[in-house]
Amino acid sequence: MSITKLARSNAFKPIPNFVRSSLRNAGVESSQNTEYPPYKPKKHHILATNLIVSYFEKGLVEEARSLFDEMPDRDVVAWTAMITGYASSNYNARAWECFHEMVKQGTSPNEFTLSSVLKSCRNMKVLAYGALVHGVVVKLGMEGSLYVDNAMMNMYATCSVTMEAACLIFRDIKVKNDVTWTTLITGFTHLGDGIGGLKMYKQMLLENAEVTPYCITIAVRASASIDSVTTGKQIHASVIKRGFQSNLPVMNSILDLYCRCGYLSEAKHYFHEMEDKDLITWNTLISELERSDSSEALLMFQRFESQGFVPNCYTFTSLVAACANIAALNCGQQLHGRIFRRGFNKNVELANALIDMYAKCGNIPDSQRVFGEIVDRRNLVSWTSMMIGYGSHGYGAEAVELFDKMVSSGIRPDRIVFMAVLSACRHAGLVEKGLKYFNVMESEYGINPDRDIYNCVVDLLGRAGKIGEAYELVERMPFKPDESTWGAILGACKAHKHNGLISRLAARKVMELKPKMVGTYVMLSYIYAAEGKWVDFARVRKMMRMMGNKKEAGMSWILVENQVFSFAVSDKMCPNASSVYSVLGLLIEETREAGYVPELDSLVNDQEVGT
């Protein structure tokens, strides 16, 4: 049995004794230039190098290093085996150290050494290391090696903030292969420049370069990144023309394109036409359904399982999010049980989805429990999800305490975290705390508050009745207030019966920005009614009738016996409507007996005014 076969067999043991013996006796080999007969074993360094490669293939990184250290003579092939092994095993820092040690000891790298160490520089995203290797490439005159040039281009495309350096290398390559083109297209796409990626793809086609399935998937991804379903359809047509429609990764990328661009009906049609489907296919469609039709996502999961597929963490994450969207607590709890039985409960992304689901379903204790179970794995999303859960249910003090605890644990908040804690302060009326966090955003963390943050603070002040301060903040905003800003002011004026100049100004601003927003007209009419200005009240209502404005009925969902039902305000067409309204009548009676008195000060009969 050869060394390589022995290494790959189940009987494989670290550093066999005969290899050690060969290494020890290496120094006493005859220096005569006699030719080895075909039956004589390979030289010691070749045996050791082959074994190093096998060690890395088996994942025995330390054994590979130990054997390498025992080699008395290390040629470029042995060094390259170590560097390539480290890079392939994701020990990128060790690959760089090994390369540095190799150069220091005077061994000149070859093109395979350089491409492997460039791969490690790319994986570490350390541009300075990659630039040093580039200098070695120039010094050794290996710039013409396509293997090295492709690796250098890949490194610059990944580590740089622009594609300038990668494009310079690309232009100097005289004979380009499919890897060259695909690397550049991928670089543009990953940097968020889908247009640049598609331009390179078009140039590739014009030069009649070989188009691989992987290159097509990147081009489709570039189309999706700029929401260009038209370009995606053109690529789809070329897929059929080139005979790649049986290539599942290509077909999955096209399905993802339709989903990301919001073409759900086309995505579903395409999905049903696909002859072959894998886990990625199903996950792609379920993920899109979670965003657009959560109840259908849950039904699709039933079909998924009926066809023998087994869910992974990504599947469960989409399903838990679907339950959160429609507040399907029972379904979410069932999924949680399955997640636990599958051993996925340690996955932090899934845990974050569960925290969010329980919070949106109003079950804060279970959100806290899941949050507590990942105490050693929490990331920024974990803290943010729990803060949002606290804030949306009025636990402002708990959200503030959690924010302070997060900061003290060494996690630096971002803009979304500040939005979460400010929103919690807004719902709980913690004005001073909210203003404190608003002020430290820029001074301590260097985060410039965006429009949403300003609107949140305006609403915080407005809800607390500090309408004058809220208006002053609007005046100081570094950008023009939008309809949400003025809407927050208007809502505060109505809630606190502040029916003066500010309320009318806010209403006028919202109507200018969103002239067809019916809620503004309704609110302004309420303000006029509260002030006793019935002429103005009638004028606003007449405007609404002339514009044909009618307030859109709100929609909601409810889960009954594992089936999701949707319903609207005053819905008489729902199943068992008579029973539903009978129960509603009983609930109204109970609320009255409990002492609830509805606010009727500004109530106007909508039927009379035609809205």
Swiss-Prot record:
Residues 485-561 are annotated as: Type E motif. GO terms for cellular component: mitochondrion. Residues 562-592 are annotated as: Type E(+) motif. GO terms for biological process: defense response to fungus; response to abscisic acid; response to glucose; response to salt stress; RNA modification. PPR repeats lie at residues 44-74, 75-109, 110-144, 145-176, 177-211, 212-246, 247-281, 282-311, 312-346, 347-377, 379-413, 414-444, 450-480. PROSITE patterns: PPR (PS51375). GO terms for molecular function: RNA binding. Keywords: Repeat. NCBIfam families: PPR (TIGR00756). Belongs to the PPR family. PCMP-E subfamily. This is Putative pentatricopeptide repeat-containing protein At1g56570. It comes from Arabidopsis thaliana (Mouse-ear cress).
